[in-house]
Amino acid sequence: MCDDLTAIDEDLALASKGLSRRDFAGLSAAGMLTACTTTEVADAAATRETAVAIATPDGTADALFIHPAKGRHPAVIMWPDVAGLREAYRQMATRLAASGYAVLVVNHYYRAAKAPLLASMAEWRSPAGQEKLKPAIATLSPANTVKDATAFVAWLDKQAAVDKRRKIGTQGYCQTGSFAVRTAAALPGRVGVAASFHGGGLVTPAPDSPHLLLTKTKAAFLIAIAKNDDARAPSDKAALQAAAAAAGKSAEIEVYNADHGWCTLDAPSYDKAEADRAWARLLALYSGL
């Protein structure tokens, strides 16, 4: 989770690279993302990007829809991390689209403001950034996630770039790892794969804890856990494995050799090697949509 202990781990990761948090924040978004560029896709498809507005029961959600310029493709809903929809996630969605997917990367904070609320993960780690996000975070709830996911899937199924004959994938990061699971549970007829990267809140005491929802899904799961998250909640992986087994679901549940945030391009803990490994597992599962 993105808590004070995670911030300490991030400081240590930056120090190992010879950077302070001030140094990291001072890097331009373009420069940081260039430095963190992940492996390019062989024979990548040309993509098309559109800023879209999607009607939901609570208003209008802004999002980016990025897909190959030609043809119909399986759809994917990408839920950004705690810092919200921003340049890092636009680049991540573009990379996925270039692999042959119609990607909707959403602003899950739309009830509070249009994206980007923050420019980078570094801004989230500042007192001003955290204060700015408080009202937006307060709008989140399991019920709202389900409403939004239902609206997003309905919208995707109307798009010419989406192949409705194929299942939908969904992936979440940090706090939205649980959103991916809830999406799969709410729309079992459409969601074929759900992935959580350094996700939080997957195992809770609540009766609607995400791990208890696996029985309501028809999806395969990729649960990629950060090593520092695992150190703080070592029993979660076993609970997830037991829940998947009880539900009869295919689930890759693994603790990666990287810290919370390692898959997000502009995170201090970004780890290219482990991010690429997780990305390869994601594409392997998505190939079956």
Predicted region positions:
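N-terminal cap/lid segment of alpha/beta-hydrolase-fold proteins
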Residues: 39-68
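Short beta-strand element of the alpha/beta-hydrolase
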Residues: 73-81
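C-terminal catalytic histidine-bearing segment of alpha/beta-hydrolase fold enzymes
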Residues: 248-289
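Short beta-strand/loop motif that positions the catalytic acidic residue
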Residues: 217, 223-225
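N-terminal export leaders
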Residues: 19-33
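N-terminal secretory signal peptides
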Residues: 1-19
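Gly/Ser-rich "nucleophile elbow"/oxyanion-hole loop immediately N-terminal to the catalytic nucleophile
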Residues: 121-169
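Primarily recognizes the serine-hydrolase "nucleophile elbow" in alpha/beta-hydrolase
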Residues: 150-211
